[in-house]
Amino acid sequence: MNYATQMEAARKGIITREMETVARKEMVDPAKLRELIAEGRVVIPANKNHASLDPCGIGQGLRTKINVNLGVSRDCCNIGMELEKARLAIELKADAIMDLSCYGRTEEFRRRLIEMSPAAVGTVPVYDAVGFYGKELKEISAEEFLGVVEKHAQDGVDFMTIHAGINRETAARFKKNPRLTNIVSRGGSLLFAWMELNGRENPFYEYFDELLEICRKYDVTISLGDACRPGSVKDATDASQIQELIVLGELTKRAWEKDVQVMIEGPGHMPLNEIIPNMLLEKKLCHGAPFYVLGPLVTDVAPGYDHITSAIGGAIAAASGADFLCYVTPAEHLRLPTLEDMKEGIIASRIAAHAADIAKGVPGARQWDDKMSEARRNLDWQKMFELALDPEKARRYRAESQPESEDTCTMCGKMCAVRNMNRVLSGAGPDG
């Protein structure tokens, strides 16, 4: 193999096995896909050590992907439950899974997740640093932060969130421009604290070239984290967020010079009317790199329903340029999600992604809806269930409320418009 990364292969004119797989699944020309990867507009997160991976592409012209977050915390450290969540995520067709474990030594869970998961696996190495070294945050050295990155890469992690954009300049901008909710990124807040405690530059920014060497070695895709993403609609599109985005655009070019694949992470909480301009800003400032957004959540007042606030924003974001949606569950801001919370979050994100794909004209997107509409016209319940995004729920609702006649439902009964139009157009009367 005469290439280190998917990007290097693409730039050398090589169509890799991973590119062929993605092109087939996405119904796109492999040569065109290779060009987009060479330009940095599409990534295929595919660590060389992730043997169970079924590769997927993220970026321009492809189906909008969704990510599921899970992992152990100090208060909830049941590895078995988190692995069960991973199995559910795979069953519900999540495209990626991020292990956000932030308590104890996490190698066992991470390795088991990578071993079982055909979906791309991501991590945030800075979360793991404190537990891995058993030190106070202030005492962790820059070299030790990089050591955790290498450990995750060796284990087979496909993409890593690296908060390199909150450098001293970005931090100074944040201090000069007060925010309602300060820094809400967990990794961003840890690095800001480390910088303040030590009076030093962000180690991931200062040693970005060394970071790139690790990522190139294992073909880890860097997901450049948005430490200054807005945590409230009031803080959206402010000086800190835009300053960091400019830095991320500069870091993107540096990564591409080393043939390292890059995604950009984005907001966050944001009013509806600011979503489309933000998608344009990211694509402009970050040179067309794939955009990975958390939501955006379009209002702050719906705890318990943030899978809905996120799906609303996610659909608009993806229709106007975002490529990758991080799911949000009803438990957001409240607790670690349960299996049922996860399912609701995944389904909501998949709805948002699919709605955006229809708008973008992604191959195959509209055809799925046309097949469903045909099944509805024919009152073919089994076909409707097969095509449903959540077949189990559709079947359960139908079974729980049985109509008098099989060709109706309990909403309209024999006044069903679809049934009666079928009968009238075939020459029969509406009753019978």
UniProtKB/Swiss-Prot annotation:
Q: Which family does it belong to?
A: Belongs to the ThiC family.
Ordered alphabetically, the record's keywords are: 4Fe-4S, Iron, Iron-sulfur, Lyase, Metal-binding, S-adenosyl-L-methionine, Thiamine biosynthesis, Zinc
Q: Which cofactor does it need?
A: [4Fe-4S] cluster
The task this protein performs is described as: Catalyzes the synthesis of the hydroxymethylpyrimidine phosphate (HMP-P) moiety of thiamine from aminoimidazole ribotide (AIR) in a radical S-adenosyl-L-methionine (SAM)-dependent reaction.
Q: Where do the annotations place [4Fe-4S] cluster binding? A: 409, 412, 416
- What is the protein's given name? Phosphomethylpyrimidine synthase
Give binding positions for substrate.
Answer: 69, 98, 127, 163, 185-187, 226-229, 265, 292
Q: Which gene encodes it?
A: thiC
What note does UniProt attach to the cofactor annotation?
Binds 1 [4Fe-4S] cluster per subunit. The cluster is coordinated with 3 cysteines and an exchangeable S-adenosyl-L-methionine.
> Which pathway, metabolic or otherwise, does it act in?
Cofactor biosynthesis; thiamine diphosphate biosynthesis
Which superkingdom does the taxonomy of this entry point to? Bacteria
Q: Which Gene3D superfamilies match?
A: 6.10.250.620, Radical SAM ThiC family, central domain (3.20.20.540)
